[in-house]
Amino acid sequence: MTKKILIVDDEVHIKMLLEQTLEELEDEFDVELLTASDGEEGLAIIRNDHPDLVFLDIMMPKMNGYEVCRIVMEDEQYDGIKIILLTAKGQEVDRKQGLEMGAKMYMTKPFDPDEILKVSKDLLELEA
């Protein structure tokens, strides 16, 4: 079964780095990578494609990551979608807010590609 992973970030280089990192999962999973450049586009992809895992930046144009996370977590049709918040905001209050909204993890940029792979594998294997 194909695992869909959505990357939502307005920074092109971050999206590219995440894509390159997550392509390594193809050794263990049938993976389809999807990308969006802002919160509205990300939410539209979530509605249409129901990804298994979403890497979601917090500070983006049009709709921030907290708002996308809130909408997804409050709507039962999206049960099972796991969100990892990625941000340059490293303050404890920001992390706490994201986790309280239902995100599975809160990671700060710059991120460790090995940690991204481990967390992704763990969350995708929970579904299997």
Task: Give the ranges of each region predicted by the language model.
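Two-component/phosphorelay signaling modules centered on CheY-like receiver
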Residues: 12-34
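Helix N-cap/capping motif at the beta->alpha junctions
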Residues: 35-44, 65
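Short amphipathic alpha-helix used as the core "switch/output" element in two-component signaling
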Residues: 44, 66-79
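Active-site beta3 strand of CheY-like receiver
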Residues: 49-55
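Receiver (REC) domain active-site loop signature in two-component systems and cognate sites
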Residues: 60
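Alpha4 helix (beta4-alpha4-beta5 surface) of REC/receiver domains from two-component response regulators
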Residues: 67, 90-105, 117-121
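A Lys-centered signature of the CheY-like receiver
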Residues: 109
